[in-house]
Amino acid sequence: MIRYLLSKLLLIEAVLLLVPVSVAIYYQESSQVFIALFSTIGILVLLGGLGVLRKPKNQRIYAKEGVLIVALCWILWSFFGGLPFVFSGQIPSVIDAFFEISSGFTTTGATILTDVSVLTRSLLFWRSFTHLIGGMGVLVFALAIMDNAKNSHLEVMKAEVPGPVFGKVVSKLKNTAQILYLLYLALFSLFVVIYYLAGMPLYDSFVIAMGTAGTGGFTVYNDGIAHYGSSLITYLVSIGVLVFGVNFNLYYYLMLRRVKAFLGDEELRAYIIIVLVSTGLITLNTLHLYQGVS
């Protein structure tokens, strides 16, 4: 079952790589970029296709298997997700490319790049797209679109979702994943529009919104959000990161008008308190730097 599920996940990543392909087509990028992307897609389709030829009889997944599947998925997706950078020569080192994309999928936001302008628009988009996919969890995304996601896959989702407790918001696991991801994508789309209306170019709006959704912070320029010279954009991005930092189960409660369940959540209260206290302390610590600045 581990082999079968991981193979399906490789096929899903192959489909996801069609997104940067479409960006490369739009911006009429070099043939080297297309070769890099399609070579990676070909490898993923070959390996994934071979792995799903034989469907396992026992499709039960236990806790230990769930943890193993999650760990292997992160490693495999990061390795193959980094290959377009290696094949195109934009990040020649396999290790550096692996680090860059694992930072994206895990929404860490760390980077080996000192100059992001070396990346073409398609691969810069893919780099931030990994934030969007990883923000809710790679396996949550996969379970949301798999046609046969079952409640037996709950152990995978438990191992994937951060936090002390994972609870299904509806009876079926697939429906839970779909609801959470629809909420996630709806908020992402909202912030794309907000950033665009605030003055960002459309491409930048997508890239920054993906970095916001994953709370990892990948951007388009070396100087990040400061590049736009807009306090409004800075505030909007800060608000966006705070919004996406909330447990998405709670947003589902809001949809159901269960306001008490939302406001009474201990995790949410702790989150707000930590943000307010840390913001206050940092403000006090840096206040002297801005004295006399008009």
What positions do the PLM features span?
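Membrane-proximal intracellular helices of multi-pass ion channels
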Residues: M1-S294
